[in-house]
Amino acid sequence: RILFVTEPPEIKKYPRSYLGQFGTVVSPYDLRGVERRSMVISNPCLSWHYGVERSSGRNISKFSNLNELRAFPMPEKTGLISVVCSTKTATSAQRARLALVSMLKERLGDALHVYGREFNPVDDKMSAIAPYKYHVVLENNYLDNFWTEKLSDAWLGWALPLYLGAPNLG
């Protein structure tokens, strides 16, 4: 059995008894209770959200395979900068992320378009990224190796990511 750890330790803790049932654990950070030979330090390989319509609750992708996504042309860039952000405040990184978005909005004004369930909801992150030259990517944590769909979505949308997250990406 293989466990892929997809949440930071502030969000999800794994008891030793739970970890013991896996022969391999793939995680962006070291987990106590996992034998060194069973641990693979790597990105959790989260799937992207770009091009995935979520309003139906069924997560329907506009692309049926990777070749269709690759063939999708670069969208026209009519906006300058966007960010997709939730209003979650459970962790210090989430609170810092909200404070940064607030400060950026105050300084950049209408040049920054803020999206997210509680701000300006979108069914598909494509509509919040594709029209913009830059996309602010704010991870939920600052752990080495731990980047998420937030970063891959910017790349897939042909937007230059302005990134705050895993310090070893760079």
Predicted regions and their residues:
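Nucleotide-sugar donor-binding catalytic core of glycosyltransferases
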Residues: 2-169
